[in-house]
Amino acid sequence: HPLSKSAVYNNVQAAGAQAIRLRQQWVTGRAGTIQALGIDFTHVKRLGQDTIVAVATSILSGAALDFDIIDDESAETIQAWVRELCERLQVEVLVSDDADALKTVADELGLEHQLCRAHVNRNVHALIGALGTQALEHPDPVPDRSGLTVAQLLDDLQQLEEIIKGLPYDGQSQLDHLAERYQTAPPPSAMAKASMLYRLRLLTLDWSENWSRLARFQHWRGTHGERLDGTNNVTEQIIGQRVKERYRTMRGYKRDASILNVSSLIGWIGMQGPDYNLGELI
């Protein structure tokens, strides 16, 4: 007799719960061996409500280490989620996007921090494109006393993008020089929009202060000489293949447990070889 939909559902949930237990056992046995932890977040619907799924991976091996549901993406919430995992595994480096909350988490946990270059490049390219368009089409007035010009700003935007993309050996000093050039750009008055000079002041200062997080991979080496590639692509791929791919065929989840069970089941099977015994999941 064919299985009913409810029987299939129950079997998948039970297998997912078992996959979570197996993964937790596997992670416990890797204490001290996972030096670089990638984290990222995605959103799915549960009974029509937005639900945040947090995902942690081993950047060097590509293994999915944890799936969890969190209330928000604040530093406090993320730190509460990831602290125990980092301590248990003795993680050295956190790899993530460039959200301020994640910088705080890395600092609070005493971890080295690598920002995802792909994510940063996209964000910086968009910001520079917007500033460049404004400077070309409807530039703000440039105060005479600043010693700056629109042409100078356009040149500096190009230089900034080249620094962020190319990560030259003297990137820190180049960024410091740019940040110094715009440090006198005045902040906007109440209810006014920030000028293009002030926006570039913030942008150059931000990357001057966070250069080490962007270029960390150039110097970091694992215990056995492992290298980072400077991206969080591993975690993004896990989200795409283990969380989002299944979600696309559904109209949403009904329970938080279902989100974790299904993602964990797919994630666990994805880590196994072609001869894996599925009987482990029964």
Q: Can you describe what each PLM-predicted range is?
A:
Residues V93-L148:
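Conserved beta-strand -> loop -> alpha-helix junction used to position metal-binding or nucleic-acid-contacting
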Residues L47, L65, K103-T104, H125-A126, ...:
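Short helix/loop capping segments that flank catalytic or ligand/cofactor-binding pockets
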Residues A99, D144-I282:
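Acidic/histidine-rich catalytic cores and adjacent linkers
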